[in-house]
């Protein structure tokens, strides 16, 4: 899928990615660290926001991700009340769920970010 970036920040530097990954216990080879290597946050198709290295820690705290979704990382949202999470395990899975959703199993699961974006954009 070819996506259209409504807003795209320049790549994050290696030091910023490494620091953020260590702070949040993110696997250095994860999807989000690879994304930050190409752009440090973006708005895709006017809807899908992927958080920057400067935003992501605050979002984990605001939505209490460690408490409600241990083992997952909040990486973005759909600009309409749904959150985008990834599994912290080695399996690359993306989840889209309402911000008030009590369980990850109540959300939609995707094997790629492209599939998730396609669902959001319609």
Outline where the language-model segments fall.
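A surface-exposed partner-binding patch
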Residues: 1-85, 90, 121
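Short, compact, well-ordered microdomains
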Residues: 89-99
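Compact, glycine/acidic-enriched structural inserts
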Residues: 100-122
